[in-house]
Amino acid sequence: GIDPNYRTSRQVVGEHQGHKVYGPVDPPKVLGIHGTIVXVDFDLCIADG
C-alpha cells in the first residue's frame, strides 16, 4: 500500500492537473504518488475499481 508518511518521506517533484506529485518519478514505469488529501500511488494502482 501507500506509505502513510509519503508527504514527509517523499519529495514533491511537480504538479499534475492541480495536485502535487511526490517522487520519485521516472516515466513511463515510475509515476509517483499523486495527491495530498486523497492520494493514488500510480505505481501500485491497477485501476480495478
Swiss-Prot record:
[3Fe-4S] cluster binds at residue 45. Binds 1 [3Fe-4S] cluster. Binds 1 [4Fe-4S] cluster. One of its GO terms (molecular function) is metal ion binding. The keyword Iron-sulfur applies. Zn(2+) binds at residues 16, 19, 34. Its cofactor is [3Fe-4S] cluster; [4Fe-4S] cluster; Zn(2+). Residues 37-49 are annotated as: Ferredoxin. The modification N6-methyllysine is found at residue 29. Keywords: 3Fe-4S, 4Fe-4S, Electron transport, Iron, Iron-sulfur, Metal-binding, Methylation, Repeat, Transport, Zinc. Residues 1-36 are annotated as: N-terminal extension. Ferredoxins are iron-sulfur proteins that transfer electrons in a wide variety of metabolic reactions. This is Zinc-containing ferredoxin. It comes from Acidianus infernus. The gene is zfx.
